[in-house]
Amino acid sequence: MKILAISDTPSKALWDYCTRERLQGIDLILSCGDLPKKYLEYLTNFTSAPILYVHGNHDGSYRHDEPGGCICVDDEVYVWKGLRIMGLGGCIRYNRDEDAYQYTEREMRRRVCSERKQWEVILNNQPPL
């Protein structure tokens, strides 16, 4: 199983030189957030691998315009080939920006603990809790 994890800054190697061959053999792409919508949609042209994503704290525009061809797993457990992946986007609140995906520590804990399904992988936007 080959998983490509991407986050925050678009890879110049993928953005400028992406081909089907370059992504060949990758089974799943996980986006940890804060990537432009256009970048994620661009990658869908070069792979048949599912692209799962969570919201980053700078993805406020996603509230009105989600990336096409990708699967948002925020606050869900997504099962892929038996692997249970929990999406936990956003970050710990650091300002009052209402458009950002920010949560208090209590809210984050509740998001993780309220998920009754078991999970093996957390797809997360911030450093470990």
Roles of regions detected by a PLM:
Residues A5-A13, H55-L129:
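Conserved catalytic scaffold of divalent metal-dependent phosphoesterases
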Residues T47-I51:
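A short helix->loop->beta-strand "cap" motif at the edges of active sites that frequently abuts
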